[in-house]
Amino acid sequence: MSIMAVEKIGVRVCSTRDLEVERGRAALIGGTQVALFLLPDGSVHAVSNLDPYSGAHVISRGMVGTKGDAPTIASPMYKQVFDLRTGECLETQGKGPAELAVWCVVRRGDDIHLLPPVESVPELLAS
């Protein structure tokens, strides 16, 4: 994929001033809800807002924390804990494995732009 194609796929979703530390925000990109998190170190993470266990769009309302050195988000529904870097569920609360799609965050000054998860790129290029 060319740099030009990536530029066309990336979308500005907000400014860092629109985010609060350790408080989630939801953004709608096309028909997909994305949860954004600003961490105390200034990093921004973006994952699917869809809780794979409950089927509800609630991840942005979860509790930010850490497990070891991994920044995490705990679902407000059944309390599963996900790694914000990889989307992996670290604490399944007795359920089967699941994960959140992870969006690539690109900062351009104060603006936050998102690139879709790798598995979504072929679909977006075809549209």
Kindly give the residue locations of the regions a language model identified.
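A boundary/linker detector
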Residues: 1-12, 16-17, 21, 117-127
